[in-house]
């Protein structure tokens, strides 16, 4: 083992919609986790890898946001986030720039007090506030928890992200190289493709629908002798009325989702894609243990 090589696992936590997936995507330098302006976009732990052969390797776990669960899927998401705190070497807690520490933040603080893992607080979106305010926010958070570091940053603008990486390496132990240098994620291509389709649906649909949708890949196969991949995917919703909205007038909404998804999938896979989408109704699937597992959210892992 290289005695100068550091390695370990880092989880990114925070309330829903605070910018966790955006931060991870920018740290890695490639889009892996889906992003949206709607809360609870991330449903699984997404494992991505940052490698600097001179310093070490960081394995990031982007977890679902910690929030009050409203159904079994919500309970699963919160359990994933909280369970991860016990598994990692460093915790990144992402917050928005504010003096207000609400019930959600207090809940996270209580969870952090149960572990001995070093916690780096990242105050995100500092590009949206005055500089003098940032000092106030840092002082506010210093009073509620003994953070290893507090870093003002902007995930979207990639501001201070080098400092975030430096501070992570500061607290990582010396250890082995877990993944090859070129590896950036342990997510299979089918899972990433499904998440891209779900992201485009999140962006296109009204607030009442997105949390009730899942996407699974029915078929994904390259054509022999051709630079093209055929992908058949199904968008699952909970209500017949939602199905109509997802399809849209004359199929316009489904076509829009498919077109936007296809463009990004082609960039990801570096090949032409023939994408076909279907919509099915599975009533109240978020309260069905069987369907939650069937759509790729595995409770047995936590």
Language model feature labels by segment:
Residues 51-55, 79-150, 221-225:
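Conserved C-terminal guanine-recognition region of P-loop GTPase G domains, centered on the G4
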Residues 19, 160, 253:
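Conserved glycine(s) of the Walker
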Residues 189-302:
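P-loop NTP-binding site
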Residues 1-79, 83-86:
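Conserved G1/Walker A P-loop phosphate-binding module
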Residues 62, 124, 154:
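Active-site glycine-centered loops adjacent to acidic/histidine catalytic or metal-binding residues
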Residues 42, 67-68, 100-101, 129-130, ...:
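Catalytic P-loop NTPase motifs of RecA-like helicase/translocase cores
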Residues 117-118, 127-188:
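Canonical P-loop GTPase G-domain recognition
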Residues 30, 49, 53, 69, ...:
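Conserved, well-folded catalytic cores of nucleic-acid-processing
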């Amino acid at each position: 083992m290289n005695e100068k090589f550091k390695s370990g696992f880092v989880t990114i936590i925070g309330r829903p919609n605070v910018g966790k997936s955006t931060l991870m995507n920018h740290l890695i330098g490639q889009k892996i986790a889906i992003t949206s302006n709607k809360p609870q976009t991330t449903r699984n732990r997404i494992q991505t890898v940052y490698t600097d052969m001179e310093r070490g390797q960081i394995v990031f776990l982007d977890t679902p946001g910690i929030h009050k669960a409203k159904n079994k899927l919500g309970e699963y998401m919160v359990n994933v986030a909280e369970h991860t705190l016990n598994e990692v070497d460093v915790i990144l807690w992402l917050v928005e720039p504010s003096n207000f520490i609400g019930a959600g933040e207090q809940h996270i603080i209580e969870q952090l007090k149960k572990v001995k893992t070093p916690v780096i607080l990242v105050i995100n979106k500092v590009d949206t506030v005055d500089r003098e305010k940032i000092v106030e926010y840092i002082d506010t958070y210093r009073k509620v928890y003994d953070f290893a570091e507090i870093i003002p940053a902007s995930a979207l603008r990639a501001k201070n992200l080098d400092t975030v990486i430096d501070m992570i390496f500061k607290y990582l132990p010396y250890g082995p190289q877990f993944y090859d240098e070129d590896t950036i994620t342990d997510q299979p291509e089918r899972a990433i493709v499904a998440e891209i389709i779900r992201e485009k649906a999140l962006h296109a649909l009204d607030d009442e629908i997105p949390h009730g949708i899942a996407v699974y890949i029915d078929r994904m196969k390259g054509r022999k002798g051709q630079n093209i991949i055929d992908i058949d995917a199904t968008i699952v919703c909970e209500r017949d009325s939602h199905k109509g909205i997802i399809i849209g007038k004359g199929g316009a909404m489904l076509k829009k989702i498919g077109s936007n998804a296809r463009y990004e999938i082609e960039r990801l896979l570096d090949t032409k894609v023939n994408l076909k989408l279907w919509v099915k109704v599975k009533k109240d699937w978020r309260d069905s243990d069987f369907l939650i597992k069937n759509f790729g959210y595995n409770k047995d892992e936590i």
